[in-house]
Amino acid sequence: KSFIMPAMNSQFYTTDKDAHNLKKSRGLKPQEGWTYETGMKTITNSSSLKLAVFNMDISNKFGWASEEELGIGTNTKAEIQINKGDFRNTGIEVEYTKLVGDNWRYNLGVTYSNPEINDSGEWVQDNARLQFVAGIGYQKNKFNAGLNYLFLGDRNDSYYHEVTSSGNRYYALPNRNIMNATLQYSADKNNSVALNFYNILDKKDVVNDYENYGLPFNWTLTYNYSF
């Protein structure tokens, strides 16, 4: 069972020009629903295999819309939290992890599902149907390294999609490919330094329904102290 309250500031949203905004924002309902999952897993000293099927049923799913879209103002940049409608998702996921020798490990995972949302009486795709992940890692003494890959396919329509004369949607978001890596050295249990590489393939990926692009290849050098 899940239950999520609206953001605190969404409950008191208003502008000087339109007091109706405040009334509308106070009508926000909690997002709540149920998730059912069952499956099997096999675990040994060097590997694990997990298989699961799941079903999600969510009411009053949170979303965001501009004043202009809601007809309560003209500001296209002022995003207001709203209840979009009902959400459902049924799918299957498989995950495999393997240790190779004393230092190496790898993992593979795939999820296929059918995420849909109903905002106006019609169920439409709300997210990518296919997700694939893969990773490889190495650890020896105080050194740790990892390389991870994510693929999102069969994605939902863009926010700016068009509708054909037959009523069929087209213009789905392109597939997404992202690869990241981390090199970490832990001097002791409290101190560590990490070099992180993001978007190694330097893909111009669309990251959301509004067709915003992710960052190009970039990296960070971080120091962590744990206590």
Task: Walk through the language-model features, giving the residues of each.
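Surface-exposed extracellular loop regions of Gram-negative outer-membrane beta-barrel proteins
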Residues: 1-37, 48, 53-79, 150-164, ...
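Exposed loop/turn and edge beta-strand positions of beta-sandwich/beta-sheet ligand-binding modules
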Residues: 22-24, 34, 78, 90, ...
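Short sequence motifs at beta-strands and strand-loop junctions characteristic
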Residues: 28-32, 59, 84-88, 126-129, ...
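Hydrophobic transmembrane alpha-helices and their helix-loop junctions in integral membrane proteins
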Residues: 39-41
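Short, glycine/charged-rich beta-strand-loop motifs at protein surfaces that mediate ligand recognition
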Residues: 52, 165-173, 179-184, 191
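Gram-negative outer-membrane beta-barrel transporters
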Residues: 54-57, 75-161, 186-192, 201, ...
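Outer-membrane beta-barrel "beta-signal"
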Residues: 215-227
